[in-house]
Amino acid sequence: MPGYQLSASGQHLPSTQAAAPIVRSWERCASAAADLHDDPVALRHGDLQERLEQHACVLRAAQPEIETLAGMVASASSLVLLADASGVILQASGNTGFLQRADHVALRPGVSWAENHRGTNAIGTALIEAAALRVHGAEHFLRRNQILSCHAAPIRSPRGEILGVLDISGDAGRMHAYALSLASMCARQVANRVIEQAGERCLYLVFHKQASLLDSVERGLLLARTPGRVHTPQGAPFHAVLRQGGHARSLPA
């Protein structure tokens, strides 16, 4: 796909091997380029506080992962961001020096990073694609954002709805591709914690093929708000624990 031109100004993807989600995003942005602006779409302070209250459950569930990741990526001039399902950044933590650079491109709480506001970017494009993805350097549609390398993964509710996005963003010259795996793993853990929080009011089933991994990030969780029966695939036994609040009961494999 050499010289893949997408905008009236002649802007084109720098890579001939751009991932399909990036190409689709550039095509969407090219058709709406006249509506994309470098100026951020930001909430007023009062509106941001109201949104933080609306998303208190996800913020509470994500806090351990945000703190852990922020400590891990601080030395790499990076930030950990939590955005809501519309793309508005709710929280940013990490390298204090990079926080100042990030502010220059409006990578801060209260600003919408929806794709129709900020062009191709990990938060907004992950929401549209409903999948974890990386947007590195010049893959960003807006040139001012091309200093960034961003890695975002959706956080899903027990019903599969997207509750928000966990993102690791940093200097494009220093970020590593494994940041996407970190973001994806932590987004799953946040989703599990949302279920556990709901489990204070109802039952949830924790399962894994190995009993020793029932408390790992790779475990599976099923939430039951009303009494019911859980069916398992034939020939696929697993170890399970039925939990409610702080109580647990082992189930036979």
Show where each model-derived region lies.
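Intrinsically disordered, low-complexity terminal regulatory regions
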Residues: 1-116, 121-134, 147, 156-226
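PAS/LOV sensory domain surfaces, especially short acidic/polar patches at coil-to-helix junctions
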Residues: 94, 226-238
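Terminal output helix/cap of sensory domains in signal transduction proteins
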Residues: 123-124, 241-253
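PAS-family sensory/regulatory modules and their coupling/dimerization elements
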Residues: 138-139, 147-152, 250-253
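Short, solvent-exposed loop/turn elements at beta->coil junctions and helix N-caps
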Residues: 138-142, 209
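C-terminal catalytic or substrate-handling cores of phosphate/nucleotide-
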Residues: 217-221, 228-229, 239, 252
